[in-house]
């Protein structure tokens, strides 16, 4: 009993002192909040240049491959494009206020290569107006207490480089990207401490060069009749190979740039799913899970950790997979301070016995069938809405983080994207979308699994970014899919409206404010009940 009385006194004293400092208690009656995570854990929202900025013909910007793709093949992007997008170029100051309003720590955005170097080449000159835009953006973020988290390349290479030499199909891209990255470090490095080189090389290589459903829209004709040219059996491997070498070249520049602070970090952003066996009793389906993870993660992470591609991919792809020289392998190995993980969903996988070897392509090299249901007909998620693009499977995030921890030496990780989609088919009102209950549940459940991965499993995760701040241009889906914490009214001047998920994050991330008496009572009660009677 004496110990309980002492504990009660200590609790009340701590509560009173904390309240006097203008802070709420570090423990909460809610299941989860900011203080459920380690000190200095980074919470933020994510975006990208083409999906947000608009102003494609303003400020000296030249066309990117996405400008060309959306205008040449509008039917492949829902008849939409990023010409205006959500007009972030003109509205960034107001949008930064929205980030601050939610108590976010950081804002992840990408640099438009064609806005900074219109020809793609540093030797051809710099667009000063484009550089100034990003300097203004960075300054505005810092002024509002928000940390800039910069991605150098998010899929929007200048069209000029593709016209000249095929962009990432050519090793010439390595030096052009090196020069672009070095310029960015020199111009912005004194105010930016968190950098990533590339966003989702898997999606960029596979969707752009195997399936052809995203820019640059290349693939074998038999894969997608809309593709004008391409080779789905070789080009995805070649593009990722050159991309990895460009990444390593950029990291070399980062580590010798005198404008970069000593505590600055650089990484790359990967986008793996988690996988479960289609048939839990099938050994071949269990092996298929490992193979899926090797192709989805190991293809790009193994070279950075171990200096080479996984043996599984080398065996399967054979001479269609380029090889690294010894020097390149050494340059790649450990060329990161952290790994960004974009996690959204999971799939069931089964071993595929029926692969047409006469028509090689990256997707069939995996010898996998990706499925939405398992053998019993159960979905990976209880969310069985047929309009969903992504299915909620929070357990997959924890499993994925543990897989990376165990297989790749527990690297520092940031969850650089995690988000929930609403498909707008015209049958849902704005009010219903803003209610946003499912998005709140999605983030809450994923944060719970993330917290367990950190505190119970020892996964080295340092931050969590939601996709996205605003509804925006979602690539081949155009504006029909909404991921934002803020609703964008595309029919009424692109006005922004907070969804309930934005309000939920504001509460979840709250740092200050005196605790209410009821909260104080409940917190004391929780401590009291947790201490054994003596």
Swiss-Prot record:
Disulfide pairings: 219-227
Gene3D superfamilies according to UniProt: Glycosidases
Glycosylation sites noted in the Swiss-Prot or TrEMBL record: 68, 374, 425
Xref: Pfam families: Glyco_hydro_1
GO BP terms in the entry: carbohydrate metabolic process; response to other organism
Enzyme class: hydrolase
Catalytic activity: Hydrolysis of terminal, non-reducing beta-D-glucosyl residues with release of beta-D-glucose
Protein's name in the database: Beta-glucosidase 32
